[in-house]
Amino acid sequence: MNPALQLGIIFAMAIAHSGAQGTVTKSSDHQREVALALEQQGKYAEAETAWRADLKAHPSRPEPYAHLGLLEAQQEHYKEAVPLYRKALALNPNVPALRLNLGLALFKGGELKGALHEFAILLKSAAPDSPEAQRLTILTGMAHYGLTDYAEAVPLLKQAAARDQQNLPLRLALAHSCLWSKQLQCVLDVYHEILTLNSESAEADMLAGEALDEMKDSAGATKMFRAAVQANPKEPNVHFGLGYLLWTQKIYPEAAKEFQAELANDPDHAQSMLYLADANLQMNQPEVALPLLQKVVKLDPSQSLAHLDLGIIYSDSGKNDDAMRELTLAAKLKPDEVNVHWRLGRLYRTLGKKDEAKVEFDKASSLNKAVDEDLLKKMGNTHPRAAETKVPQADPTNP
């Protein structure tokens, strides 16, 4: 699944949902009053029983379906709420706030394409520049964000941010969308807006650093990540980001310290463990690197660099079978990595397998050495969150 839903990326919009102030057609029967009272008391099971009894007595009325959907949504049973809201809409598509509550249930349940459809209908009828239009613009932008349609999210979140000059979470979401859609100047522009709201935002410094790294400004990126570390040394990934930049510049001793600092914050941070091991290997400390690499491949066996480094260590210590296993795995995971084929060629030559060695050396010579993976791609696998926000709740007065 996509980054925004799959990994716990939490959607957040600091927006209060007031909802429309209309009501569904109400009957004055006793059963309905009982159901409403139980619902207001938070007695969900009893309220559901009462609303189902009301539904049985009045099967053509949308109100029982709407309230049953609301009860499910209040218990975070969003997928169960959706068909109930849809049934209510089928009976009366003009019930105030009902379509919005359906859209919110779809959004929170991860059915973002369905949510977009409902938000689009609502946006058409919302008054321009109204609070409702602002709310729907944000929700639409965040739905695109969740679908990884970052380029689609940018203009919507930019429009919403222009209408809310003090909304920091909204600007962080916008900055992430700009970054992941490669609109790098947009990231820097939003970064300066964020600084006016919070001059000590480590996350904003990191975003600016990632953008500068994409723009090949290593010095500027490093400066931004140093500022982020100073602003909040506990910010997830902040030490890894700085360490990785230093590692790309071959400043291995300082890079190792940053990877160690990230591991102090998160002991299972596989990327920091991997690059700490590689930094130690680059500093001729294979005995320090080996246990780290062995742990990395247990945590994440898809890391080609870990297998390459293990292959180097085993090869240098004469453990040729182990070296062959690791280098072969590295070649399968990253077949266009020159160093893997060069190391395999050396190992085959050591084993007296001249033909196999020639094949690997030929592969190495025909490949252009891959450029080091950039910081954005590295951090895309480990970034714990995007902008944190709250999704508006379903309107209990207008289910």
Q: Locations of the language-model features?
A:
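Position-specific recognition of the canonical hydrophobic site in helix A of tetratricopeptide repeat
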Residues: 39, 66, 70-73, 100, ...
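Helix-start (N-cap) detector for alpha-helical repeat units in TPR-like alpha-solenoids
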Residues: 28, 62-63, 96-97, 130-134, ...
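Structural marker of alpha-solenoid helical repeat scaffolds
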Residues: 57, 91, 125-129, 163, ...
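Structural signature of tandem alpha-helical TPR/SEL1-like repeats
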Residues: 40-53, 74-87, 109-121, 146-159, ...
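Alpha-helical segment of the N-proximal tetratricopeptide repeat
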Residues: 27-60, 70, 74, 142, ...
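Canonical tetratricopeptide repeat
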Residues: 33, 67, 101, 135-139, ...
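Terminal, low-structured helical/coil segments at or just beyond the last alpha-helical repeat
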Residues: 25-29, 342-399
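Bacterial N-terminal signal peptides
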Residues: 6-16
